[in-house]
Amino acid sequence: MITIDFEIDRPRNVSMHLFDIRGRKIRTIFEDQTFQSGHFQEKWYGKNDRGIQVSNGVYMVQFISDKKRIERKITFIK
């Protein structure tokens, strides 16, 4: 399991997606969800959108809010 921490500075709609190293979207954590300001955590248990366990490796977390896009690498190890 991986815990993904993020901060929201003001109320906004946010999407969070996970991509494999080849750039293929493997999981939508949430899509266009409204968050108030604050600190948040999402847990990812290493499964794709079909519920299949992914392989160990490096993945990209993508946050999209308004016109801002942030990406960061995470490493998943079972």
Label for each model-derived stretch:
Residues 1-18, 44:
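Glycine-centered coil/turn sites that cap beta-strands in beta-rich domains
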Residues 4-5, 52-78:
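C-terminal tail/sorting-segment detector
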Residues 7-9, 22, 73:
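Intrinsically disordered, low-complexity regions of eukaryotic proteins
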Residues 11, 25-54, 65-70:
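Glycine-centered tight-turn motifs at strand-turn-strand junctions
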Residues 19-26, 59:
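Short, glycine-anchored, charge-dense loop/turn motifs used at functional sites
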